[in-house]
C-alpha cells in the first residue's frame, strides 16, 4: 500500500510538501518526495491523499487507561496494589483492559500508542507496557513489554502508607526502600552466574532489565526536591531515567538539561499540596532549557482524547507549535524508549498515522483526524 500526494511531517519544521509513504506488512518501507515515486509502489493498492497532511500516530507517554476503567469504581480499579510498598514484579499487561472505552476515544483523537502502567501509591509500583490503541487482545497490541518500571516519590506513597501506619511514611522512607530493593536486585543479578545461584526472587528478577538499562525508570515526582531525589537514585544505580510529571521542573530547569521528562497533566486543578505551584509554562521552560519534553494527560486524570488540547495550552504559554508536535510524537517515543518503533515517519517503523486535512490546526478543539491508521490499516474514518 502507498499513500501519495500528501504533505508529510518528518521532524520539527521539516516536511515533505508533496510526498509518498510506501508500507507493507504493517511496516514503513519507503518515504520520499513524489518526484522519486516508483509506479510499482501502487501494485498493493494506493490512496491519493491530495489535500491532506500526515503525522506519525500520536504517542501518549503516561496514562492508566484500562487500569482504571471508564464508568467503573472498585470493579475497574486495578492500578494500585496498596498492600506492599515494593511491587516491581506487578505487570500492567495483566491489568489493562483494551475493551475500555478510553482506547477507542484515544484512537479517534489520532493516538495510536499508549504507555500504560500502575499508579503512584507504591515507591516501586510495577512495570509499564507500550501498546497500540487498536485491537482486542492486549498481547497482540504490544509494542514493547515491559517498557519501564514505575517508581513514585512524595505525597502519594506517604499518604498511602501513613494511613496504614507502616513504612514509608516519610520521603526518607520512600527513598530508603527504593535503594534497598535496587541494591538487592543488583546483588541478586551479580550472583546469577555463580555455581551456587540465589533462590528465585520475583522482585529482583523484574528489576534486572532495569539495571541493564533495557527499560526506562519512570519516576513519579512533583516537587523540586523529589525531582532531585529521582536524579540522585538514578545516578547511583545507572538507571535510564524519565521524570514523570516534574511539576516544579520549571523552577529548577537549569538542572534538567538533557533529562527525559513527561510533563502533565497540564490541564488540572491544584488537587494536592505538592502540585500547588503547577504552571502551564512548564513544558515551554523545560524545552527552552534543553530537556527532552513530552506531554501527557495522565488519563483518566484528564481525558486522553484531549491530548491535543494539552498541547494547545503549552503553545499558548510559549512552546512553539512545531515543538509541541514533537511532545506527542518523537519526544514521547524517545522518553519511553520506543523511538526505534514509533514516533516518526521513516523506514522500518510501524505504519501508524494520524491524517488531517491540510489546512487544519491539529491543536484546535474543533479538529480531529480524518483518518487514523494502525499497522498500515485505516481503523478510523471521521
Go through each PLM region and give its residues.
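C-terminal cap of metal-dependent C-N hydrolases
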Residues: 6-10, 14-19, 346-382
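Histidine-rich, glycine-flanked metal-binding segment
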Residues: 8-55
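Active-site gating loops and adjacent loop-to-helix segments of metal-dependent hydrolytic enzymes
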Residues: 69-96, 131, 137, 152-154, ...
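His/Asp/Glu-enriched, well-ordered alpha-helical/loop segment
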Residues: 70-71, 77-83, 87-89, 216, ...
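Alpha-helical scaffold segments that flank or form the walls of functional sites
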Residues: 74-124, 168-194
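Active-site core of metal-dependent hydrolases
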Residues: 92, 186-279, 334-336, 357, ...
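Metal-coordinating catalytic core of metallo-dependent amide/deamination hydrolases
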Residues: 130-232, 236, 300
